[in-house]
């Protein structure tokens, strides 16, 4: 029963305890530094600590129990490191999780189907045209006032430090506008802290926004009771007019959480495409050969306890039309302007 920021400390300690569990697991089970040993180590790490195995089996039919035998057939004692990497990365790719990666000196194993398999619904050239050349910059926020007195803010990342002062300056500058467009397209995440600081500017009351759970054992269903997550209204300037938040499939991780937190705010409309998802808080471990593996460790849900791992639907579905693109028009921005000017 606390806000997201105050729960971060608990999360950190939870992850510290979680890391100790992983460490003790590795000490108990030693794997050889050969192709079979590295595959078995990777399979075991995911089997005991990845948080979406049952959900992925239910939704996309991934049965992790059969993956070890399936991919062991592709191993040989004479295979190169590059060949071993391809096999291990392919096994991880079955999970279809952008937070699951295999890191080696020569490559990063990944599955980016959460946005690569869908229309982009975004044009950097068009966004640059709407921003013009005289826009202002406050940390990761680019902003200006459009000719119809609509504020336009681009937030392309939560990886750059974003402070309360930055956000207050932006909202103060745009305070005379009739409405606000917050363009989150292509924002693939970063810090949950920065995402929450921005979300707090769109609520005037404490709101339940979701839940988080933690692994408590090695079983696929071994989780703690879900803990509620809240956002508190900011003590700084809060936006008191209508706002449209633009999304596409590249909205991932912390941005997915941001959309969860602001969707349902009385004055906020989410417009665009379903987000890419990525609701598991990531954690890292290591294989016998030194390669690092990242995976989702703690599942997060929305306020109705729905999974958001595969993304969040917008309030208004909207796609960038090729006809508009050819004419130098961003369909989503224009639809947002029309809505805000009604």
Positions of predicted regions on the chain:
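Generic anion/oxyanion-binding catalytic loop in active/binding sites
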Residues: 14, 73, 325
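Alpha-helix termination/capping residues and helix-transition junctions
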Residues: 19, 174-176, 237
């Amino acid at each position: 029963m606390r806000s997201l920021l105050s729960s971060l400390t608990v999360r950190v300690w939870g992850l510290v305890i979680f890391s100790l569990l992983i460490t003790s697991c590795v000490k108990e089970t030693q794997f050889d530094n050969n192709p079979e040993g590295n595959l078995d180590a990777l399979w075991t790490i995911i089997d005991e600590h990845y948080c979406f195995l049952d959900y992925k089996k239910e939704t996309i039919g991934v049965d992790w129990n059969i993956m070890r035998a399936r991919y062991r057939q592709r191993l040989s004692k004479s295979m190169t490191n590059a060949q071993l990497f391809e096999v291990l990365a392919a096994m991880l790719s079955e999970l279809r999780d952008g937070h699951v990666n295999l890191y080696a000196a020569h490559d990063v194993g990944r599955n980016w189907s959460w946005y690569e398999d869908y229309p982009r619904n975004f044009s950097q050239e068009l966004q640059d045209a709407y921003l013009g050349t005289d826009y202002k910059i406050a940390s990761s926020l680019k902003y200006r006032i459009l000719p119809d007195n609509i504020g336009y803010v681009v937030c392309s990342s939560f990886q750059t430090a974003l402070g309360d002062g930055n956000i207050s300056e932006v909202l103060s500058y745009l305070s005379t506008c009739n409405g606000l467009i917050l363009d989150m397209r292509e924002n693939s995440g970063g810090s949950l802290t920065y995402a929450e600081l921005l979300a707090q500017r769109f609520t005037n009351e404490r709101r339940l926004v979701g839940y988080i759970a933690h692994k408590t054992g090695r079983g696929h269903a071994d989780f703690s009771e879900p803990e509620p997550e809240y956002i508190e209204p900011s003590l700084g300037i809060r936006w008191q007019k209508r706002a449209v938040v633009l999304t596409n499939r590249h909205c991932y991780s912390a941005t997915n959480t941001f959309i969860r937190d602001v969707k349902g705010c009385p004055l906020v409309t989410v417009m665009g495409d379903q987000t890419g998802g990525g609701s598991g808080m990531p954690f890292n471990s290591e294989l016998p050969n030194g390669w690092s593996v990242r995976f989702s460790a703690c599942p997060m849900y929305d306020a109705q306890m729905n999974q958001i791992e595969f993304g969040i639907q917008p309030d208004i579905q909207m796609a960038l039309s090729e006809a508009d693109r050819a004419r130098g028009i961003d369909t989503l921005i224009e639809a947002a302007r029309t809505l805000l000017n009604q």
